[in-house]
């Protein structure tokens, strides 16, 4: 299960808008999820956050 509490709000919102990314994220290992969350915490803009989320599907 996904812990939305640990997610930056912008990341959670972007993920919620992208069903494919949410499914792909849920299927990742904890380590891979953690790497993505680290990048999401460092995102400086909404556009960067969306790039991180869309990158989940394309990885």
Describe the residue ranges of each PLM region.
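Charged, low-complexity intrinsically disordered segments
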Residues: 1-59
């Amino acid at each position: 299960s996904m812990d939305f509490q640990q997610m930056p709000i912008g990341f959670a919102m972007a993920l919620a808008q992208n069903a494919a990314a949410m499914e792909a994220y849920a299927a990742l290992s904890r380590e891979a999820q953690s790497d993505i969350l680290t990048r999401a915490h460092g995102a400086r803009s909404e556009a960067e956050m969306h790039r991180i989320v869309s990158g989940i599907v394309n990885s």
